[in-house]
Amino acid sequence: MRNNCNNNQYDYENYDNCRNKREQTHVHEFEGSTMFAEECEDRHNHRFAGVTGEAIRRGNSHVHKLATNTDFVDHYHQICDTTGPAIDVGNGKHVHLVKGYTTCRDGHRHQYIFATLIEAPTVNENDYDC
């Protein structure tokens, strides 16, 4: 139930900032809802959405880091995690599984499990003839 939030999650020094011409790698959108927490009148869950960081090579696949806040229902939680490796969905596309726990707020935390959205699901390099 450890949460991976920390101040050093992203390596901002290596991001393209006009002086650094490093080629960027792909990202994924994500959205989901946490599992319910607490009981009776306090029982609730939260929604979240965001965009992952760039691909990070891991073995013969890759992963992505992500960080976002949930919506506010008297309080909010943070989600900071690393995806699992790429899962092929055909046609050269893939998704990633993410499973973990939010930060603890208001005396509780929420479990989440979701898959990222397909990277560039509608983009085809021939779609934009200039």
How would you label these PLM feature ranges?
Residues 1-130:
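Peripheral, non-catalytic segments of secretory and membrane proteins
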